[in-house]
């Protein structure tokens, strides 16, 4: 029997489901359609619908008022999860009357355990069964939580948005830089990483960027790396004072445009040091993969990932290879944030000591495998998610 999602929506316009609970008014394919995430209650067009279209995964979609049966998901795409919003108070009463399952779809890495606690509180407040909803999260810890499921949305999102850009041809000639290191926005742990790499001479052999002007309200006190234990406070302050740093001609907005591509970021260096979005994923114990990781995979580079513990294992679970034969990836197992960074830094320094051309040749088979694996259809990812959700429903 063919797997098929059944989605319920408040309205369907020109084949697109109108974002659930939304107060903002817009029509598909307009500039306003991209503004939902900035307007209360910050629900957005559900990317899961688009992934099904892109990868030819069967689905039905209809309005709540027209559907028959209870085997439909009332999908709520979240721009971000706001703990001050009572989501169930906004859900149409007909959804609960018809026995539909509310499906939250959230591609960010916030701690899913905290989200579950909040949603369960709201269920109790409204007299709802806590099994009335399922939640899809970009945090791998979700797979360990009842009614939650992990899905690597950013893999499919980058696959789709960068689809018009051919994968960068892999070459084996000499390259002018050892590493590529890109930072579009400032966080204090990222500045700590970059200052430490600078102190060890890694930036001297790298093409790299760090935009000190784009900030996200990060508090220095929340730095998960113990900056004073590494005696880096002065180095970080000096590093920030000299910024911003760039290695291309793109603007900050263009750096965040997944449709754009700078081939030299991948062809001019041997290894990509990925500075991920989160280093400790909101104290969740999970990992969070974004387009930052999938860019070097698509465009043919080995990588070291400066991110949460278990990030490399999450990639392996998705079928990717992590160059264990030439990189000491033990850092991925370290739970202590400061120690994990030290181990990752040591792995980077060890790569720098190698003959770069010989090192790259050893990586050849895995580079090619990763690129081809990324370019393949992601229909299997959707099927895995479908099975996860049905299993959750069957065990409620």
What does each model-identified segment do?
Residues 2-274, 280-290, 294-299, 303-396:
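Pol beta-like nucleotidyltransferase catalytic core
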């Amino acid at each position: 029997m063919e797997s098929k999602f059944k989605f319920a929506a408040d309205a369907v316009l020109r084949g697109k489901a109108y974002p659930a609970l939304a107060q903002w008014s817009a029509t598909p394919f307009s500039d306003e359609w991209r503004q939902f995430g900035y307007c209360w209650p910050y629900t957005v067009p559900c990317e899961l619908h688009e992934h099904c279209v892109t990868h030819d995964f069967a689905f039905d979609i209809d309005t709540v008022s027209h559907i028959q049966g209870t085997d439909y998901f009332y999908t709520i795409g979240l721009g971000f999860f706001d703990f001050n919003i009572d989501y169930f108070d906004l859900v149409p009463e007909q959804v609960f009357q018809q026995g539909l399952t509310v499906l939250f779809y959230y591609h960010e890495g916030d701690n899913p355990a905290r989200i579950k606690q909040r949603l369960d509180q709201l269920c109790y407040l409204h007299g709802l069964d806590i099994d009335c909803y399922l939640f899809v999260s970009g945090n791998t810890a979700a797979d360990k939580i009842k009614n939650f499921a992990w899905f690597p949305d950013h893999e499919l999102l980058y696959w789709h948005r960068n689809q018009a850009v051919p994968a960068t041809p892999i070459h084996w000639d000499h390259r002018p830089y050892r590493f590529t290191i890109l930072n579009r926005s400032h966080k204090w742990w990222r500045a700590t990483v970059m200052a430490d790499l600078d102190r060890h001479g890694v930036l001297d052999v790298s093409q790299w960027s760090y935009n000190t002007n784009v900030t996200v309200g990060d508090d220095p006190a929340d730095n998960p790396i113990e900056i004073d234990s590494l005696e880096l406070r002065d180095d970080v302050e000096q590093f920030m004072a000299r910024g911003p740093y760039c290695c291309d001609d793109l603007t900050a907005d263009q750096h965040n445009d997944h449709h754009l591509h700078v081939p030299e970021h991948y062809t001019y260096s041997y290894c990509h040091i990925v500075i991920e979005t989160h280093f400790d994923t909101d104290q969740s114990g999970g990992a969070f993969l974004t387009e930052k990781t999938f860019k070097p995979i698509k465009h043919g580079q080995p990588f070291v990932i400066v991110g949460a513990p278990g990030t490399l294992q999450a990639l392996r679970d998705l079928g990717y290879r992590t160059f264990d034969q030439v990189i000491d990836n033990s850092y991925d197992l370290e739970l202590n944030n400061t120690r994990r960074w030290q181990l990752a830094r040591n792995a980077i320094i060890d790569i720098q000591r190698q003959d770069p051309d010989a090192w790259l040749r050893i990586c050849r088979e895995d580079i090619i495998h990763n690129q081809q694996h990324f370019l393949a259809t992601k229909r299997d990812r959707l099927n895995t998610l479908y099975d996860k959700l049905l299993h959750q429903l069957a065990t409620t």
